[in-house]
């Protein structure tokens, strides 16, 4: 993967505005445990519509894209929460989503993606890893590719968790 310039605070702030109405502003709760002078807080991202913070990044990436690039739909390469985030976001935006998975992906993961409206494309595991690590393209795929980890908008969207933590617990 190519190195990225560090994200700026403004990118996280824009993402925070961008995900309004889709991602839930989850609570930050203190865990009640007696550990020598230690405070532990939990950010309850399990309350997101897909049960994961990955929704934040997927939504921000799609809402930040040029609408013309979304006309053919979106696709990603993931076996789990990012795939569900892209599928959920695409369904909400009324566009097509395809998820490229390794051919040995588990039935439960595939069922969750399909339940959210995603089309599934199975490919050999080695090709799937190459797609994520190097090529970011695959024959026959159309639409906007949303990389599950190295997409700048995905990173900014997921980083909105940090902004919420700072708002709820400024002295963190």
Give the role of each language-model region:
Residues 1-172:
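PLP-dependent amino-acid enzyme catalytic core
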